[in-house]
A protein has these predicted regions:
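Active-site phosphate/pyrophosphate-binding segments
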Residues: 228, 235-355
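Glycine-rich oxoanion-binding loops at beta->alpha junctions
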Residues: 129-149, 174-175, 180-210
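Conserved phosphate/anionic-ligand binding catalytic regions in large, soluble enzymes, centered on
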Residues: 159-173, 281-288
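Extended, charge-enriched "interface" segments that sit outside catalytic cores
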Residues: 13-21, 28-29, 33-41, 45-152
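Glycine/threonine-rich flexible loop motifs
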Residues: 222-229
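Conserved beta-strand elements of the Class I
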Residues: 158-160, 212, 344
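A glycine- and small-aliphatic-rich helix-loop capping segment at beta-alpha/alpha-beta transitions
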Residues: 169-184, 205-207, 229-237, 264-270
Length: 357
């Protein structure tokens, strides 16, 4: 599902309000905006099939949106008028489409095959991505196989991910949705709330000797994350009484090597983040280390291949049969023309009813 998209004249693309394609949609809305869903199905009994699409293993039925064939045609015309295909190509190329921060938005590179080349600032970032994946896999398989030993020589049985926002929500969602694939001899917990109760509850039944913490913070200065990380460190040290134990029970995902080293985490246990990955799109980067530990390297890479399949669909499918594009265009129609400003996401599958939905 796509979030609601409100467009105003103050936005950088607000000039589209004066475009002929936008005005055509306004005129179209004046004729069809009051139609009831019953009327739409009565006029086109086959709309349940006509307004449906399958791609990358997903089936989208958008027939219950208040649209007809002309609505769809006009929305696609609007997308073309705005240069969506060109903007899509720019994103995949690594152009600086994140205009507020003057950065690329290359989360798609995180699931690109090793054979691909994407050059950013003179560097093939795909090489960096796969080097990080291989390091993640090495750690994950050691933990899963009992080769990663804690300070006292015991194997790790508990993994606690400490993060907030995109460093928490994606991993939580992925773990809960895929928990049937997770290792039976490991427990996964997630701590994001600065309220100390969150960490207390997560560690209540855990043994420090068997617990590994993953601290996810690009700057290693995020208040909530570092508050919880230091509390976890203190919890661990109460058992060991030895600062050297931190190196066996904490790993980090960060770009701040100095702060991580000061915390006591070994440089070899620090995984990279990149400015060209937004937090909300980071679950397939090292932020997903907890997911990889839970489900294993093979399943994690299968997850990446699934994402890649949808990337390729988005990149190449005609706009009228392009699932992400259609969801975005329907959001524009529902919000800006029908006045539907709230989007409900109602998963029927219990595994998808995470706190992040």
């Amino acid at each position: 599902m796509s979030a609601a998209v409100a467009i105003t004249a103050a936005d950088p693309i607000g000039d589209l309000l004066s475009r002929g394609t936008w005005k055509a949609l306004l005129e179209h809305h004046a004729h069809v905006g009051g139609q009831h869903m019953r009327e739409l199905f009565a006029a086109d009994p086959e709309r349940g099939t006509r307004f449906a699409l399958e791609a990358a293993g997903l089936y989208l039925d958008y027939s219950k949106n208040r649209i007809n064939a002309e609505t769809l045609r006009l929305l696609v015309a609007l997308a073309l008028d705005c240069g969506l295909p060109e903007r899509t190509a720019a994103m995949f190329r690594g152009d600086l489409i994140n205009r507020s921060e003057q950065r690329a938005a290359l989360h798609t590179a995180l699931r690109a095959p090793a054979s691909e080349r994407i050059i950013l600032d003179g560097v093939n970032i795909i090489t960096q991505v796969h080097a990080a994946l291989d390091r993640m896999a090495e750690l994950a398989e050691k933990v899963r196989g009992g080769q990663w030993l804690g300070h006292t020589g015991k194997r790790i049985r508990n993994v606690v991910n400490i993060g907030i926002g995109g460093s928490d929500l994606g991993p939580v969602m992925a773990y809960e949705a895929l928990r049937h694939y997770s290792a039976a001899n490991l427990t996964l917990s997630f701590v994001s709330n600065v309220d100390g109760t969150d960490l207390i509850e997560a560690t209540r039944d855990l043994e420090p000797e068997e617990t590994l913490f993953i601290v996810c913070s690009k700057s290693f200065a995020t208040l909530e994350t570092l508050t919880n990380a230091h509390a976890a460190r203190a919890w661990s040290l109460r058992k060991f009484g030895d600062e050297r134990s931190v190196a066996r029970h904490f790993v980090a995902v960060s770009t701040n090597a100095d702060a991580v080293a000061k915390f006591g985490i070994a440089p070899s246990n620090v995984f990279p983040m990149w400015d060209w990955v937004g937090g909300r799109y980071s679950m397939d980067s090292a932020i997903g280390l907890s997911t990889m530990i839970a489900i294993g390297d093979a399943h994690f890479r299968e997850l990446l291949r699934g994402m890649r399949t949808m990337d390729e669909h988005f990149r190449s499918a005609p706009l009228a049969r392009n699932m992400p594009t259609l969801l975005g265009l329907l959001s524009v129609w529902n919000n800006n023309f029908l006045g539907a400003t709230t989007l409900a996401v109602l998963p029927y599958c219990l595994l998808y009813t995470s706190r992040c939905v």
